[in-house]
Amino acid sequence: MKLTSEIIQRLPKAELHCHLDGSLRIKTIIELAQIQGVELPSKDATDLLKILSIGDSPGSLEDYIGKFDITLSVLQTPESLERVAFELAMDCHEDGVRYLEVRYSPILHTKNGMKLSETVDSVKKGLAQ
């Protein structure tokens, strides 16, 4: 039997180390930035994807971690955290992921005054949907 992308898609999978703030849809980043008045390095989806992608030569750890500044900038409200958690769960489900361990640092989402408990509750609510 030849292993095809369709077969792989149907196989049950486990995602054991998934960073919430590294799993946003490009369209969602742009929409949340518009809603929240956040300035992005580009409003064009193709350009933003290039900016956020690692590519073949990842560069330094500092370069890699710096990309999270962009996603974190739009994850400072309960609504945005709930939305991206929900979208992550949906995307994983569509990819055949049946077990998902999501990680994030709640304190990185408190820059605009959100409480730590709000960050946790929002992510839990999004994942539970």
Question: What does each model-found stretch correspond to?
Answer:
Residues 1-129:
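Metal-cofactor-binding active-site regions of metalloenzymes
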